[in-house]
Amino acid sequence: MSLNYIKNFYEGCVKPPTVIGQFHTLFFGSVRMFFLGVLGFAVYGNEALHFSCDPDKREINLFCYNQFRPITPQVFWALQLVIVLLPGAIFHLYAACKSINQDCILQKPVYTVIYVLSVLLRISLEVFAFWLQIHLFGFQVKPIYLCDTESLGKKPNILKCMVPEHFEKTIFLIAMYTFTVITMVLCVAEVFEIIFRRSCFLFKR
């Protein structure tokens, strides 16, 4: 997905009412997607092909790889992006249908509450994704994976498997954790900005 396409799509939508929200949308839409789409494919694209066990047999490699990766990181992070973007996308779709502009979101309490709820839901989804990512992938990719082949009736029951490019994958994991933390911080900051700007609007009245 090109940056021009994202820019045109972004300009056609109702922009978030906060400066932090606009930066967050641009951050999400360009940097995170580019990082995942380009670098994620480069690091994880051929992982299954280069994952090898001892003995190096195709059926054993496939079995152990499926055990090592119940879900591939690319699929997980793509789902994370889509799910986390949903609350904001639904709100902006609703705002576009109702012809709600940026000022209305901050001036009318009902729109402010709905927008804040969408941001809080986004934070909750990011926290859940962060916990799930830790549970699935941990913080480090080790060069050796011990595969349990007892269900295959193979002996020995524990086989050693080589994980390709484990150091690059560890760096990428840390980067994705960092993206999630930055996103959560931006969302929290956006809530405070909304409260501050709403308070200023009420004070001026």
From Swiss-Prot:
Q: Which Pfam families match?
A: Connexin (PF00029)
Topology with respect to the bilayer: Multi-pass membrane protein
Domain of life, source organism: Eukaryota
Which compartments is it annotated to reside in? Cell membrane
List keywords of the entry alphabetically.
Answer: Cell membrane, Developmental protein, Disulfide bond, Membrane, Transmembrane, Transmembrane helix, Transport
- InterPro entries documented for this protein: Connexin, Connexin_CCC, Connexin_N, Connexin_N_sf
Per its record, how is this protein called by name? Gap junction epsilon-1 protein
Q: Which organism is it from?
A: Mus musculus (Mouse)
Q: What is the lineage of its organism?
A: Eukaryota, Metazoa, Chordata, Craniata, Vertebrata
